[in-house]
């Protein structure tokens, strides 16, 4: 497939690692050439902003939004372009990339668990209060946070036979709250989080303690 792509990004953060002020955002767009075998488009926006509350405390707001659609003779958005949600950097307290629509269980497989398949709509947001840890000499390399996360992925074109497909609905957003620590080491950033998913539904895969290597704010 021949695709057309465009992207925009800007950063006005006060520092590259563990910022305490400023903002950053990025926007990407992709679409296939009209007349292609598959005709679809995909747009994704990510943004974050930091508000210093006091000398020690900072409020961070983050959002990640995505939408994929079709045009021409294509009716279904391709699964390999789906968005995923859950995990570190997303909705903590849920296992990575497990939220949202799932495969429909086969009549011959009554005991297997449906697999996450993502969706063509992504909605995520976070609010965090960042603060230093006491008795830490270099505060620029270690930061703690109290956070609330919300989000999910959805499918706006659910097949009639699907039993685990989530259409766009505010009531299907998942929420979590917890604490996290990010440490900038000489090897790579290390992040830990303890999160409580407080509206977990049947079938959701929760994960209270999470760890990730290589991600900062």
Task: For every predicted segment, state its role.
Residues 159-180:
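A short alpha/beta connector and helix-capping loop motif
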Residues 139, 173-217:
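In a subset of proteins, long, contiguous C-terminal domains/tails are tracked
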Residues 1-142, 146-166, 203, 211-216:
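C-terminal outer-membrane beta-barrel translocator/porin domains of Gram-negative envelope proteins
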């Amino acid at each position: 497939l021949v695709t057309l792509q465009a992207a925009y990004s800007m950063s006005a953060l006060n520092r590259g690692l563990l910022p305490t002020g400023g903002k950053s955002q990025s926007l990407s767009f992709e679409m296939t050439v009209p007349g292609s075998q598959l005709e679809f488009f995909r747009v994704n926006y990510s943004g974050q902003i930091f508000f210093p509350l006091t000398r020690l405390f900072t409020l961070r707001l983050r959002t990640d939004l995505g939408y994929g659609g079709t045009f021409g003779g294509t009716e279904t958005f391709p699964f390999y372009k789906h968005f995923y949600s859950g995990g570190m950097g997303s909705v903590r307290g849920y296992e990575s990339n497990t939220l949202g629509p799932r495969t429909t269980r086969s009549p011959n497989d009554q005991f297997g668990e449906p697999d996450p398949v993502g969706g063509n709509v992504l909605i995520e947001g976070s609010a965090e209060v960042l603060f230093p840890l006491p008795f830490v000499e270099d505060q620029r390399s270690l930061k703690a946070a109290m956070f609330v996360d919300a989000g999910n992925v959805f499918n706006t074109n659910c097949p009639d036979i699907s039993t685990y497909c989530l259409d766009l609905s505010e009531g299907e957003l998942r929420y979590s709250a917890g604490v996290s620590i990010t440490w900038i080491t000489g090897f790579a950033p290390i992040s830990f989080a303890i999160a409580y998913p407080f509206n977990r539904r049947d079938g959701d895969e929760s994960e209270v303690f999470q760890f990730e290597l290589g991600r900062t704010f």
